[in-house]
Amino acid sequence: MNYLDRNEFNFEPSQKVVEAIKNFDPKTLCFYTRIYDQGKKSVISVRLSEIYGVDESQVLLTYGGEDMLKNAIHYFLSVNSQTGAPNTKILIPEFSWWYYNRVASECGGTFEMYPLHEKEDTFAYDIDEVIEYTNRVHPRMLLLASPNNPTGNGLTPEEIGRIMENIPSDTMVLIDEAYASFISTDTAYIAPLVNKYSNLIISRTLSKFYGLPGLRVGFGFIGKGHDQFESYINKYLGYNRFSEAVALAALDSDEHYRKVADDMEWGRQLYKKELGSLPGFKVYKSVANFILIKYPIAIKESLMEALKVQEYKIKFMGDKGLEECLRITLSRKEQTQVVCDTIKKCYLQTTAQK
C-alpha cells in the first residue's frame, strides 16, 4: 500500500541516518545518559542550540511534536501561572488539525476558532484580524500553525513578529512549525523572537522535513522565564539514547533532505499543471509536504475505487468547508505521477459519461 494520506515520508532516510542505525551499540541502552550531570537535557538539545543559536536552557525536547503540543496546552490551560486564576481558553485557526481541539478538551480547556481565509489559490491568516481577535478574547493561549495542516499556508517571520508585538503579554503563543523547512530554509528569526518574547513557544519535529515520524522526536524553543514549565516537560533521567543517535545524524543531513524537498516541488508543479486547469479543480499553494486540491465531488466514488485498486491512499477531507478537497502527501515522482494520472483519468471518464 502507498500511504499518501498521513503526510509521512515516502523516500529513503539519509545515508548518515542509516549508518547511525547500523553502528549503534545496543549496550548504550543499558545506561542512562550522563549529560544531565552537566546541566544539559540531551546531546540533541545541545546540537539544536548550536544550529538555531538559542540557549540550550530554552530548547525543549519531546517524544514527537504531538507530545510538545499536549504538554504545552495541558500545562498552560490548567492554571494561570501569574494570577492563579483559571483561564482555559485557547484560540485555534479554522481549517486546522483536529487534534488541537481534542488536546484542549482533554484538560478541560475551551477553544474558539478564528478565521483562516481562502484567497484565490491559497489560504491566509489576516494578521490584523488575529491581533484584534486575540485582544478582544484575551485567551490564555493563541495557537498558530505555520505551515497549517491541511491548507498548506504559512506565516512570515515579519507576520509572527507583528502578532507578538500587538497581543497581551500574558497570552501564551504556541506556533506549530511541524511542516516547516520544505520551502524556506530560514531559521534565523527563531532566536530573536524567543529571546524577545517570553510568551512564545515554537514547536518543531523530526517527523516531516527529516522524514522520521517513527522515531518520535519533537523539539521546540521557549521564551525566557518558564523554569516551572521546563521542569514539567523535561525528563530527569534523559531521553531515548537510540533516538538521540539517529536524530544527530538526521540533523547533519540537510543536503539529503533538501534534495527530497526538490522532488516535492516537482510534485507541486505537476499537480498544478495537470489538474489546475481542469474545470472544477483548484490546486492550492503549499509550503508543506502535502498539497490541498479542490476537486469535482462527482468523481469521489470512482476515484476512491481507482486508488484502492492501485493500492494508494490519499486523504478525502471531511472537515466543514473542505468537503470537496483532497489532501495528498507529496512523495516520490513515480507515486505522484500515478495519483495525478488517476485523478485526471477519473475526471475525464466521468465528464465523458455526461
Predicted regions mapped to residue ranges:
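PLP-dependent enzyme catalytic core of the Aspartate aminotransferase-like
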Residues: 158, 309-310, 315, 320-354
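Short acidic capping loops at alpha-helix termini that bridge into adjacent secondary structure
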Residues: 55-59, 86-89, 170, 177, ...
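PLP-dependent aminotransferase-like
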Residues: 77-140, 144
